[in-house]
């Protein structure tokens, strides 16, 4: 038989305003004390053409009122029966509950949908065979702290006190922080350490920190905070070891906030070859030089990896006497690896140390280091270019090469050895500032111009061209032709454009012929 309810279930539309209450009742689209009801979307209804509710909210309301007709209608519209039963339980409309009881296989499924603790408990009571512990477990899962508070005395009872541990673990696994804190303040937890293991496995720093709050608050309430300092440090050190093993830096930092030993953390990190942790702690915890040396000795003793040893070595300025002191330790533990690093890779060690000097030290400190280790100017300047320390480059190069022309010649040679473009341009900029600060001989300026062309230093080349044209005029003809040839060969269009402009000036001044231009690049300048 044709059913209007079926039609409404398949379609969304507005009811005509002229439908009477009697008509709506006959159609089954009238909700007592609310008015007309119709479906407007897949999961929404409208009451009296005004109020919009989700189907499940409407089901819960209908369940509270015990209106089985509306419940049936909303179920036709794909509502969730669980909400109707929750509503019925709230107002104790057990007739409706009994009507649909057989359709519920497991009453625990409804519990996460319930916000009211009384209704929560009523629903759980329908699960035959379940006890108080089952109720408390689901209360923890669903974050129903008020239920645990209600049964606090039962939890303190010696008969079920041992179940506190399982509730505590369950709360930790489900991140129920309020419940965890309440248990810590009100109940006795046999093994509170479980919170830290769970936090590390799940990488939950917030849970990890809460564990310390629970334990240390308990110690303070009991007046044993100072008496158990040794136990406290053992606890912190154990957690540092757990965090180091998993490589969890945020957990280590959290432990340090509660009094953990940074030296212990570094020792564990050295043994486990956790280089990122070592590097972070050394840089952010102001670790003394002596401590780093002891860590290096520990790394030798524990046969740490090459990368760990190299990292520790890079923090220290190792002059000859320091290396000899270290060798005494490595020989004692027969660490051939570190011997190979120091003897075979000494160059790399110096590079790493020099890089740190260039990055963080003053001109005088860098100069002293270069003298102590006979560091070549070229090596220093290439590192300084990488770190963008132009002041150091100018100072050291001026100190080594007093003559500006010699300084520029040596810096130009270094430019040719730098493999990355940004580094070459950085050093070329420094060369140009030297040129601007001194009066160079014409032949040096001409060499500098061709150097700029070869490295596509457009701005600096343009600056030199202006100087050459103003001061040498047509005497620069040979230079411009040479620069044109280089620019064309290397395909530097901006340089070619600049050179072409000055060749045009030369041509206009009669200082250059069409034939001379075409000898260089006939096709490019056939227009002449």
Swiss-Prot record:
The lineage of its organism: Viruses, Varidnaviria, Bamfordvirae, Nucleocytoviricota, Pokkesviricetes. Plays a role in virus cell tropism, and may be required for efficient virus replication in macrophages. Interferes with host NF-kappa-B promoter activity mediated by TLR8. Mechanistically, inhibits the phosphorylation and subsequent nuclear translocation of host NF-kappa-B RELA subunit downstream of TLR8. Promotes the expression of the autophagy-related protein host ULK1 to degrade host STING and inhibit the interferon response. Inhibits also JAK1- and JAK2-mediated signaling and thus negatively regulates the IFN-gamma signaling. This is Protein MGF 505-7R. InterPro entries: Ankyrin_rpt-contain_sf, MGF_505. It comes from African swine fever virus (strain Badajoz 1971 Vero-adapted). Keywords: ANK repeat, Host cytoplasm, Repeat. Belongs to the asfivirus MGF 505 family. ANK repeats lie at residues 54-83, 129-158, 261-290, 292-321, 322-352. The keyword Repeat applies. Its main location: host cell. GO terms for cellular component: host cell cytoplasm.
